[in-house]
Regions:
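Non-catalytic architectural context of zinc metalloproteases
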Residues: 1-5, 42-44, 71
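Charge-rich, low-complexity N-terminal segments
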Residues: 1-23
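Active-site scaffold of zinc-dependent metalloenzymes
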Residues: 25-68, 81
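Acidic-and-aromatic substrate-binding clefts and catalytic sites of carbohydrate-active enzymes
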Residues: 63-64, 90, 100
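Short, conserved micro-motifs enriched in small and acidic residues
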Residues: 68-69, 73, 94-98
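Active-site recognition of the HExxH zinc-binding catalytic motif
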Residues: 72-84
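Short helix/strand-bridging catalytic loops that position acidic/His residues to coordinate divalent metals
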Residues: 85-92
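Post-HExxH zinc-binding segment in Zn-dependent metallohydrolases
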Residues: 93-117
Length: 117
């Protein structure tokens, strides 16, 4: 088996999510973020194509949250991204180091998008 490609994206608003869904050709997407959740992870896989994973973050609903609370929420969702990646790659269930690297990458990517530092 060769390389396994997984596309990852981040949508920090419902507007960005709708734009991404349109660009991906998804005509009936799942809701942006479930009510009260603050963030969610969406997966998309077309036959014969690679998996796309989107982390969605509702900045409006989290406007009263501290940076630490937001970062914790992003870390939580990054763990879900890693779970989906490992499942898609058919990685061994005990692939702890691979899981940790994925979480680290996703968390760093998203917090850089949010905070720019």
């Amino acid at each position: 088996m060769g390389p396994i490609i997984v596309h990852f994206g981040f949508c920090g608003s419902e507007k960005a999510y709708r734009k991404t869904m349109k660009r991906m050709g998804v005509s009936d997407p799942m809701p942006f973020v479930p009510p009260g959740a603050g963030a969610s992870v969406r997966t998309f896989e077309k036959p014969g194509s690679n998996m796309t994973i989107l982390m969605c973050y509702d900045a409006e609903s989290e406007s009263g949250s501290t940076r630490n609370q937001i970062d914790s929420l992003i870390a939580h969702e990054a763990a879900h991204v890693a779970q989906y990646c490992l499942e898609y790659m058919r990685e061994k269930p005990d692939a702890h180091e691979t899981f940790a690297y994925i979480v680290q990458y996703v968390f760093g990517f998203v917090t850089n998008e949010l905070w720019g530092d």
